[in-house]
Swiss-Prot record:
Its EC number is 2.3.1.-. This is Acyl transferase. Keywords: Acyltransferase, Luminescence, Transferase. It comes from the Bacteria.
């Protein structure tokens, strides 16, 4: 289902099992931009909505990419459910539903960009989707370590019956028991499980780390890549950045530039990101960001009026 809109970004709704809905945003390639072989799916980081990636979508669109974003079920954003019921498996279910929906629309060639916690979901999903390439940015490779850094305590070390009701993540209440039980039951929690997911990866893969990231160990990212049997993977560092890639405009622009270069390179079957890009103006990025926030608020208000 497609919602009519006066905005450049197109809102779609996927209906999934249990009468739940996943909102998907589509940004078409800029007119007269270079032709690309692949679309790009963006999986936002934890507690980040689609509109947080408005600027990146503009960069990619300006450089010829058809961009797809989505809000996971039981997450912040427009899709069904609340974040206190979010699990890694629900995140994976949401990604697979979006890929299935793209297939019905004959969008079969796509690369993936996943950041932070969503990268761990992407790592576990690649064997079930036919992606052309993968780009991650400050991606979790050791979920237990990263959660301990983010939450201030290693909650996955506790017995289930000793967990608090909720875990506070940047002001959002994550359901402790349901999240921890899913992590432990389905093997999401450590570096070894990530290596197991990625060992036989046979598509190009670029991992961006941040040299001031306190949530992800760069040496563990290197360990992950060294265990991938393919030689089509490479690591780059976003210098001057912490885990928060939007902490200032310099860091944010470097992130947009680097990911766009990686997408162009990998669309051309290369790992060297020394390529030229076209950059949107600051004014253009500001307009896109404001318009997407307005669009999100309108959709939220429509949902409230119908409830």
């Amino acid at each position: 289902m497609e919602n009519e809109s006066k905005y450049k970004t197109i809102d779609h709704v996927i209906c999934v099992e249990g009468n739940k809905k996943i909102h998907v945003w589509e940004t078409l390639p800029e007119e007269n931009s270079p032709k690309r072989k692949n679309a790009i799916i963006i999986a936002s980081g934890f507690a980040r909505r689609m509109d947080h990636f408005a600027g990146l979508a503009e960069y990619l669109s300006r450089n010829g990419f058809h961009v797809i974003r989505y809000d996971s079920l039981h997450h912040v954003g427009l899709s069904s459910g609340t974040i206190d019921e979010f699990t890694m498996s629900i995140g994976k279910q949401s990604l697979l539903a979006v890929v299935d929906w793209l297939t019905t629309r004959k969008i079969n060639n796509f690369g993936m960009l996943a950041s932070s916690l969503s990268a761990r979901i992407a790592y576990a999903s690649l064997s079930e989707i036919n992606a052309s390439f993968l780009i991650t940015a400050v991606g979790f490779v050791n979920l237990r370590y990263s959660l301990e850094r983010a939450l201030g305590f290693d909650y996955l070390s506790l017995p289930i019956n000793e967990l608090p009701n909720n875990l506070d993540f940047e002001g959002h209440k994550l359901g402790a028991e349901v999240f921890a039980r899913d992590c432990l039951d389905f093997g999401w929690e450590d570096l070894a499980s990530t290596i197991n997911n990625m060992m036989y990866l046979d598509i190009p893969f670029i991992a961006f780390t941040a040299n001031n990231d306190n949530w992800v160990k760069q040496d563990e990212v290197i360990t992950l890549l060294s265990n991938i049997r393919s030689n089509r993977c490479k690591i780059y560092s976003l210098l001057g950045s912490s885990h928060d890639l939007s902490e200032n405009l310099v860091v944010l622009r470097n992130f947009y530039q680097s990911v766009t270069k990686a997408a162009i390179a990998m669309d051309n079957d290369h790992l060297d990101i020394d390529v030229d890009i076209t950059e949107p103006s600051f004014e253009h990025l500001t307009i896109a960001t404001v318009n997407e926030r307005r669009m999100r608020i309108e959709i939220e208000n429509q949902a409230i009026s119908l409830s």
